[in-house]
Each structure stands twice: as C-alpha cells, then as structure tokens.
Amino acid sequence: MSHHPMRLTIVGCSGSYPGPESAASCYLLEAEEAGRTWRILLDLGNGALGQLHRHTDPLGIDAVFLSHLHADHCLDLCGYYVMRKYHPTGAQPQIPVWGPSGTAERMARAYDLPVDPGMTEEFAFHAYGDNGGVVELGPFRVEARRVVHPVAAYALRVTAGGRTLVYSGDTGPCRELDEVAVGADLLLAEASFRSGDDNPPELHMTGADCGRTASHAGAGRLVLTHVPPWHDPADAEAEARAEWSGPVELARAGATYDI
C-alpha cells in the first residue's frame, strides 16, 4: 500500500459478460486502518474470482458490496463460496455481503442450494434499503444510492481517509447518480452504450453520459468501465472527452489507481 488513503485495482471491467481482455465487473478497494490493510470488493462478476488471485489473497477480503444481481456483477460469489467453505486451511470466517434485497436467495439459486442455509454460513447477507443506505466498515464509508436499471441497482460512493470513489454500477443517466457523484475524486462510470445507437432508456450510459455526469459532479477524474466486448472502448473515451475537459481514461484489467 502507498501513502494514499485508498487504492483501486480493476480486477474486471468487461461489460455484460467476460471478454478476451478482462473478466466481468469487479473492483478491489484497499485502505489502511489500525495498522492493517482493509480490502473490499465492489461486485464479483463472472470470471473475476480467478483474476482476483493476481492482486491479493481472496481469503483476505473483508466484505463484498454488490451493485445489483445481474450475472456479470455477482455470479463469482458462487466460486468464492466454495473457496471460503472448502479451503484446505479450514472453513473461513463469515464475511458480510451487501446487496439488494433478495441477494441471499439469488445466490443460493445460482449455486442450486436450498435457500436455508444457502450461503448464509459463509456470508452474512445484508440488504441496502430500497433507496440505498450507508455502511461503515473499518476505514470505509459506503453509501449506496438507488439508480435506474431493469432490476434494483445501486451506485456506490466509497470514502476513506477523506478521499472518495463513486462507482455507477449499471444505470441509465439519472439525477440520483448526479447527486451521489458530486465531489468524487474518481468517478468509475459505466459506458455500455454508444451515442447514436437505438438505446433503450433507463438501462445503461454512453461515454457522453459519463462525461456529462463527471462534469456535473466536478469529479477529479473519470474512468470509463463496463464497455462490452462488441464495442470499441475508444468510442466511449472520445464521447466522454467531447463532454468533459477533465482527465478521462479507460478501465483495463490490472490497472491500479491511488485515490
């Protein structure tokens, strides 16, 4: 860890499904408190657990925060359940998993487990309120804010040591994201759609939408993520740059940011 209050590692950033260069969505955040490094995950999409081994011991994660329950954001919790339950060093202590209401049942179904106990011995499942809520864990303060998507979905505002990362999760452009993103040092925003395509409303954002959100928020920098393998990420970057003059870059697997 550096002297920076919070470090972000892009474990996976491919939109909608794993691509040839990256697993699906997963972001590792690390911060120091009381003489140790705390580690949380924002999402754990398909393919991400394998890549997580490259960056840290997966058994050392303190909590998982899920933005929503689509497969590309939550499904590797199944493998993580196996790892924590059956690891040769013994069953691991239960850790909290925060997500929308119904997360425990969704993950039990995904693994074809009886809902009781499901994964509740390995993970202490907690639900955000309908509109969101605030969680404090070690050095981290995590604020969840309901955004617009076909399922219950949340943007996550994470603060540690006076520095702030805002992760859009999956969302269309909305007032709620604009509000929760205000003052973000780093805005990690999804750019699944291309401007000019026939894009359904309240589903995903374009690079231009991300640029406008960053501008409205007065963000320190914008990192574009969740571009699906069928699009060219350079298009999203160009769109964002046309809307916002601040620093823009494309998320790539393995990249780290000191915030």
Model segments located where?
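Binuclear metal-dependent hydrolase catalytic cores
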Residues: 2-167, 172, 179, 237-259
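Cap/insert and terminal regions of metallo-dependent hydrolase folds
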Residues: 173-258
